[in-house]
Amino acid sequence: MGMRMMFTVFLLVVLTTTVVSFPSDSASDGRDDEAKDERSDMYELKRNGRCCHPACGKHFNCGR
């Protein structure tokens, strides 16, 4: 295979991957809602002065 052919195949793979990934984004909407709930729980714990999540645990006591 020549360099042009390899570059063309590379572009086709990249474009195909990009086009295929767009429709699958809408399928993750249900999982996004669950993640938002977990984040809101984390912020509620931060307001109470305790948080066991790694993102806020270094600033607050875990309370366990």
UniProtKB/Swiss-Prot annotation:
Keywords: Amidation, Disulfide bond, Hydroxylation, Secreted, Signal, Toxin. One of its GO terms (cellular component) is extracellular region. Residues 22-49 form a propeptide. The modification Cysteine amide is found at C62. Residues 1-21 form the signal peptide. It is found in: Secreted. The cysteine framework is I (CC-C-C). Alpha3/5 pattern. This is Alpha-conotoxin CnID. It comes from Conus consors (Singed cone).
